[in-house]
Swiss-Prot record:
Subunit structure: Component of the UAF (upstream activation factor) complex which consists of spp27/uaf30, rrn5, rrn10, and histones H3 and H4. Interacts with rrn10.
Ranges annotated as spanning the membrane: none
Main location, first listed in the record: nucleus
Organism (species): Schizosaccharomyces pombe (strain 972 / ATCC 24843)
Any one annotated GO CC term: nucleolus
Function: Component of the UAF (upstream activation factor) complex which interacts with the upstream element of the RNA polymerase I promoter and forms a stable preinitiation complex. UAF seems to stimulate basal transcription to a fully activated level.
Protein name stated in the entry: RNA polymerase I-specific transcription initiation factor rrn5
One Pfam match: Myb_DNA-binding
SMART domains tied to this protein: SANT
Length: 556
């Protein structure tokens, strides 16, 4: 009995479930038909609108008809395909246009395009603007459209489905992250995985973490070095400016009626900078020691030059450059003086006698010295046969003279030409970066101060003997040994450095001179007087050589 009741209940309960499923399926079917109806209606409206636009266009511009264009017959269908292909691919892509019109070749299509362009050009040049506006379309009237391929449409549909389903790649990859570990982190900075970022950056940029030429860090000694330069140069500038300001009032101070104090003006500071040559650059030193600063090897005819030989060659080129530019400037000054003299003489003659004959003018012109171009041509013709180097030098002088004529006769123009000459001297050689420093380069780069201290003691011992005098006389290096500067007694001495440490005993004069001359490397400016009292180990402390054009710092 109970089983029959349960069966009845199950049969009764099955009826409403089947009814709900039927109702749900009918609603889904209704929604599907409704969406389909809306799609068909929208498509019909679009087609109707396009047909209306096409009918209006035909009413306005007419229907294409067949005609002969440049000896070739074009039917209405071919013209329609032609304009569709031009709108899709452009008028320059003849191959794609010819692919769309199988009955026409690329040459025939090109002739049709040229005929249309010529007609358009004639219409723009010979038809009034009011009439032309009725015959031609404007760019703003042309609808903006872009034609997409079926592959692009399929890809867009696929991306849209992924966005709706929530199955994008980033969601799949990040779904396994532990949310509890993220909550336990203290700050937002902990969310960055620095190790993974480092790996990604190394894979992306493909270069080593360490630079090939790492620069030395700026130490406290370098900062003090720069501050000392600024202080010393500023002191010189202020002192010279005060001297110039006082010189302007020197005569007025002699009279008791005037009791004014000198005032430093702007022109005093500018003139002081020119007196101290702050506005000039050491151009020869810059280009001469460029390979040394950049740690380059110098090669000439596939042979590496030593530093001393390279400096000697550059100094000889420097002397020739100074001589050449000096002659050019002297010649230019003389030409300017001759021109000014001739102009003033001609002006005074015109004022005294307004009517000069052609013969007198010709005689005055002939009396002027010959043009420098003829002199240069004569020098060039004479020296080319006998002295080729001199011919090249005179040719360089003419080029430098033309540069001086084009630019203003100023210090900046002279420095620019001089810098170009020295730069050309440097690039005559082949320069390569040094991969591995040799023993000689290593000694030249860093030098123990203990060697300098031994040398200073040796020099102090020999100062009163004949050995030191012989050493100073027979020294043929770049500079002499100066104990003090001529301008300031506080400037520290510039000392020679030699490869081998100088012995403490005093040998013969000839042995000292030969030993020191053979071991000469460069110049070093350092305060050696305070070195014995210093707490630092002189064996560990190293010094670098300074160039001949670098200045020493005043002691504190």
């Amino acid at each position: 009995m109970s089983s029959s009741i349960n069966g009845l209940n199950e049969s009764e309960g099955s009826t409403p479930l089947s009814t709900a499923s039927i109702i749900g399926s009918s609603e889904q079917l209704y929604m599907t038909h409704d969406e389909r109806y809306l799609d068909v209606l929208q498509q019909y409206e679009v087609e109707t609108e396009n047909k209306r636009d096409f009918d209006l266009e035909e009413e306005q511009w007419g229907v294409l008809s067949g005609s002969c264009v440049d000896g070739t017959y074009w039917s209405a269908e071919e013209k329609e395909l032609f304009f569709q292909a031009v709108a899709r691919n452009g008028k320059r892509d003849l191959d794609l246009i010819a692919y769309s019109i199988p009955s026409k070749s690329a040459v025939q299509i090109e002739r049709y395009i040229n005929a249309l362009e010529n007609e358009l050009r004639w219409l723009r040049n010979h038809v009034d603007a009011s009439v032309r506006s009725q015959c031609l379309l404007k760019y703003e009237d042309i609808p903006i459209a872009m034609e997409m391929s079926q592959n692009w449409i399929d890809w867009e549909e696929k991306i849209a489905e992924r966005l709706l389903e929530g199955s994008n790649i980033s969601g799949v990859e990040t779904s396994h992250y532990n949310a509890q570990s993220v909550k336990n982190k203290t700050s937002n900075e902990d969310l960055f995985d620095t190790n993974e970022m480092r790996k990604i950056s190394e894979r992306f940029y493909h270069f080593d973490r360490q630079a090939p030429f790492p620069s030395n860090p700026l130490s406290a000694g370098a900062t003090e070095f720069l501050l000392q330069i600024i202080k010393s140069k500023l002191k010189e500038l202020i002192g010279t400016s005060i001297f110039l300001a006082e010189s302007r009032f020197r005569k007025l101070e002699a009279n008791n009626a005037f009791h004014r104090k000198p005032i430093i003006k702007n022109r005093d500071v500018v003139l002081s900078g020119k007196f101290l040559r702050f506005h000039r650059f050491n151009i020869p030193g810059f280009w001469k020691y460029l390979p040394t600063r950049q740690k380059m090897n110098v090669y000439k005819r596939n042979k590496r030059l030593k530093f001393q030989n390279y400096i000697h060659i550059m100094e000889s080129d420097e002397r020739q450059s100074k001589l050449k530019l000096g002659r050019v400037r002297a010649r230019k000054t003389k030409n300017n003086e001759n021109t000014m003299f001739f102009d003033s003489k001609e002006h005074s003659t015109d004022e005294s006698d307004g009517n000069l004959g052609e013969h007198d003018v010709k005689r005055k012109v002939d009396s002027v010295p010959a043009d420098e171009t003829s002199i240069n041509g004569f020098k060039k013709s004479v020296n080319q046969a006998e002295y080729p180097d001199n011919a090249q030098m005179f040719m360089d002088e003419s080029v430098a003279e033309e540069s001086l004529v084009e630019i203003d006769d100023s210090v900046e123009a002279y420095d620019m030409i001089q810098s170009k000459n020295y730069e050309s001297f440097v690039w005559k050689y082949v320069l390569h970066l040094t991969d591995e420093m040799s023993t000689e380069d290593a000694l030249f780069e860093t030098i123990p101060l203990s060697n300098l201290l031994a040398q200073k003691r040796m020099k102090d011992k020999l100062k009163g003997s004949d050995v030191f005098t012989t050493l100073k006389i027979t020294s043929k290096s770049l500079h002499n040994i100066d104990e003090h500067s001529d301008s300031d007694d506080e400037v520290q001495p510039i000392c020679y450095y030699y490869k081998d440490p100088v012995v403490s005993h005093a040998p013969g004069a000839a042995e000292v001179v030969s030993e020191l001359e053979s071991g000469y490397v460069g110049l070093i400016s350092y305060d050696l007087s305070n070195l014995p009292n210093s707490t630092e180990d002189p064996e560990r402390k190293l010094a670098k050589p300074v160039s001949s054009w670098e200045l020493s710092l005043p002691l504190k």
